[in-house]
UniProtKB/Swiss-Prot annotation:
Entry cofactors: FAD
Cross-referenced SMART domains: GIDA_assoc_3
Gene3D superfamilies assigned to the protein according to its UniProt record, in alphabetical order: FAD/NAD(P)-binding domain (3.50.50.60), GidA associated domain, C-terminal subdomain (1.10.150.570), tRNA uridine 5-carboxymethylaminomethyl modification enzyme MnmG/GidA (1.10.10.1800)
Subcellular location, record wording: Cytoplasm
Pfam families for this protein: GIDA, GIDA_C_1st, SAM_GIDA_C
The protein's name: tRNA uridine 5-carboxymethylaminomethyl modification enzyme MnmG
PROSITE patterns associated with the record: GIDA_1, GIDA_2
PANTHER family on file: GLUCOSE INHIBITED DIVISION PROTEIN A, PROTEIN MTO1 HOMOLOG, MITOCHONDRIAL
Gene Ontology BP, a term: tRNA wobble uridine modification
Subunit comment: Homodimer. Heterotetramer of two MnmE and two MnmG subunits.
Binding-site positions, FAD: G16, A17, G18, H19, A20, G21, V128, S183, Q372
Organism this protein belongs to: Geobacter metallireducens (strain ATCC 53774 / DSM 7210 / GS-15)
Biological role stated in the UniProt entry: NAD-binding protein involved in the addition of a carboxymethylaminomethyl (cmnm) group at the wobble position (U34) of certain tRNAs, forming tRNA-cmnm(5)s(2)U34.
Amino acid sequence: MEFIDYDKQYDVIVVGAGHAGCEAALAAARMGCETLLLTINLDAIALMSCNPAIGGSAKGHLVKEIDALGGEMGKNIDATGIQFRILNTRKGPAVRASRAQADKQLYRLRMKHVMEQQERLSLKQAEVTGIVVEDGEVRGVDTKVGVRYLGATVILTTGTFMRGLIHVGLTNYPGGRAGDLPSVGLSDQLRELGFAVGRLKTGTPARLDGRTIDFTRLEPQHGDDPPVPFSFSTERIDQPQVPCYIAYTNPRSHEIIRSGLDRSPLYAGVIEGIGPRYCPSIEDKVVRFPEKDRHQTFLEPEGRDTVEYYPSGLSTSLPIDIQWAFYRSIEGLERVEIMRPAYAIEYDYVDPIQLHASLETKLVRNLYHAGQINGTSGYEEAAGQGLMAGINAALRVRDKEPLILGRSEAYIGVMIDDLVTLGTREPYRMFTSRAEYRLLLREDNADLRLRERGHAVGLVPEGAYQRFLEKRERIGAELARLKGTKLLPSEADPDFLAAFSLTALQNALTYEQLLRRPDITYEELCRIDPRAAEVPPVVREQVEIQIKYQGYIERQLDQVERARKLEGTRVPAGFDYGALPGLSAEVREKLAKFRPDTLGQASRIQGVTPAAVGILSLALKARG
């Protein structure tokens, strides 16, 4: 097929307009690059294909980090959310996480509007069927209608669209998601270029008609009052909140599900792709946990102006008649109507072990991958990768070094390091347990960790940056004040001393020492320190956490410092592991396969022993 060259060349071309593509395109354009975003359907920009929510455990951390770096996801959910909650409030600050229900259509429309208003960003509807590669470098992309777009860099954010195949029972048909065509040809070309292309599977529940649900028999779940925003730039959430509802499956539901397993593509061997371990279908739960007589579901509204509800935790690929029966077996849903059937989808992905930490591919220069093409699941994981790919493509255009976030700097850094160091054979989801320095990587300090980095690359506007500097200065000043202000036993309020078992106090205590006690909060401190009441809540929170967890934080910082040497030692491209005496054949094979960029990455490859890392370290030192 002959292609017509488009009459404009771009710095960055982004393929796909899901959550990864949106962040990638916005980042590149905001950094001054002429950017083109190509998508199969312009009306599906930032569409929430599965649950109508942003955030959750570890995912909320990712959104905060995206926002701190100058991304859009946090602002978008703040403007379109309909219920906001902080999870794990009874646990420590490291695992507290923000989550919000979204108005699904408003979320999509606002993101599309933001992108349409962005300077240097062009949006076009087209299906990309291949990339243009010359001399090992990407030069542009080809589209189904015969137009070739040329660009200095290309970012693939294809989601579930590459050879997407939708399953409902034993019926299947091509699709990128329900209602959209798949992308055909692109993954075949990637395979021909030498990429290891695999197959994954995910699924989504049915969408239920809220008019046919008896909510009086369900338990409502309300959001926090007042709602806490995601973005560090959002002052408050003004829109009214909407409740979710809790329901449960029962033994009858499970009998119905078992009766349909012979027509389940999952259990009939029709689906080849590997599904998400931590988001199993309801038939998977029933089979794997036969001792459980019920499973919880949250009925989540898809928006204010729609009757559609999303039953979380009830994804399935069972036949439609089994879907009708088992959804209607749930109390409160006896008369429920399905508006959109549940389905599973198989799609191609590219093993992320073939990427550098910048998300540039090792096989084709200037080509970047982000989102589900890398084997991840989740909007937030995709958005974090998209943001980093967009930043690094723009930096490549400027001929600057890439921005690489370390495991001690961000959950985004943990995620990307996991992907490019270990690869994945199943959909990867972020968890706080994946981060070894999670006390340093809290939601509340994402701006303190990353605002400087976002400003340095040009994504954080000057006004937002100045507000951040003022906040940081106030935190430092308050920490110094508390350290230098003392409570004298002779002058202290006797009631305060009695309340906290301090009546026997003989020596003065600083306010810092008082606040370090687990039973004394900032609120309590206000009883004896009028100035504490004047401290803004965001400063107060940060100061209290830093004081109460100081010992733990210092220990983790020591661990980071010890690991820094490994992370900073680069392994040259094409390094000959076969020439290293002392390495076992297994270690040589793994190092040659994974091709780590740094000594730190090498140390995290399964089977590479500390002794092998030591040998490699000595060899690198000898090379100078």
